[in-house]
Amino acid sequence: MMARRDPKSWAKRLVRAQTLQKQRRAPVGPRAPPPDEEDPRLKCKNCGAFGHTARSTTCPMKCWKAALVPATLGKKEGKENLKPWKPRGEANPGPLNKDKGEKEERPRQQDPQRKALLHMFSGKPPEKPLPNGKGSTESSEHLRVASGPMPVHTTSKRPRVDPVLADRSATEMSGRGSVLASLSPLRKASLSSSSSLGPKERQTGAAADIPQPAFRHQGPEPLLVVKPTHSSPEGGCREVPQAASKTHGLLQAARPQAQDKRPAVTSQPCPPAATHSLGLGSNLSFGPGAKRPAQAPIQACLNFPKKPRLGPFQIPESAIQGGELGAPENLQPPPAATELGPSTSPQMGRRTPAQVPSVDWQPPHSTPCLPTAQACTMSHHPAAGHDGAQPLRVLFRRLENGRWSSSLLAAPSFHSPEKPGAFLAQSPHVSEKSEAPCVRVPPSVLYEDLQVSSSSEDSDSDLE
């Protein structure tokens, strides 16, 4: 019967019985695997330990309840400061403590200069400083006065003071102390307060006396001034400089001192007229066509006025339109025809009556002409109430190419109506001479040409 049994089945039963016995005998905690079962090349993904995989039953993550708590490795008394060092005795102090002790023990030596200062300001004998140095700080509280710098400092470290400054301050304070010593305490306090307030008041007073500039010019700006030749009861002359810029276009005032140093030039055949532009030469011409007018050569000469005159006058709209025509293209005065008249500038835009220039009163000065690109406009009529003077007039001439040029003369030729909406413009005296023949044109033709030119200029500026 036993021989007939299969040996394989018997072996299987034996293995099962052995495994059951091993499971029963196994301890509650995790069993440490034998060294032959551990493979250092394996790493568990759950706990991160080497020697087993995540499927292994030895992983502490699977049998967490049976995991062992890591025990302490024992106490190390060497790391714990159970016996701290005792403080060093005073008999053998260290180098740092020795220096510190010497500074605290020895009192701060007071020189005779400091004693004199203490006696001056406090009126009491100086107190003896304590060994810890606190008395010196308390006794010098009253020395902090705003009257001036003092060489006395209350810090423990004494700074280096220049001997020259120390001697000077000592003499000043000693002289001041002799005066204060004879006064009562109330007067001392009042003097100290006044001395502390003195520098501030002087500073404010000096700041108040500083003149502030009225205008600030942005870059070199040409000036244009027109001055009448009418007589006035007040006497003197009034000049209104005009400064034009690209952005603002406002009129600004020029100082009268800048024109006193200019040389005087006299012209021979010039009638007494008045214009002045800061330029050696400028061109102006008026054209009836829609195109931009070509410029005619103009040059100015100078002449002394007989006496200073003053006269307010207004500018008609036709004169303003004529003065705002195209910009000059060449500023080289040819020797042919020399005339002075209104010229325009690319920097000057259209002005409104609200932009009125300021007025400076000064005696007349004859000045040479300089190059300018400003528009010069003036009235053709004198002010009411002026007697014995010739009014200003503008003479317009027709050139060969059909253009117009203007010049100032003394004899009256025609009168244009004044309008209240025009603004004022004046300039210093400049007389002129003209070598070209004069051709008189009726005012109606002139006004028509000016209106056509101004309309064409407006259309060109709009297109640009």
Swiss-Prot record:
Region annotation Disordered: where it falls in the sequence: 1-42, 69-373, 415-437
Biased composition annotated in UniProt, kind: Low complexity: 180-197
Pfam families the record matches: zf-CCHC_6
Compositionally biased region (Basic and acidic residues): 74-89, 97-114
Family: Belongs to the FAM90 family.
Record's protein name: Protein FAM90A10
Lineage per the UniProt record: Eukaryota, Metazoa, Chordata, Craniata, Vertebrata
Name of the gene encoding the protein in the UniProt record: FAM90A10
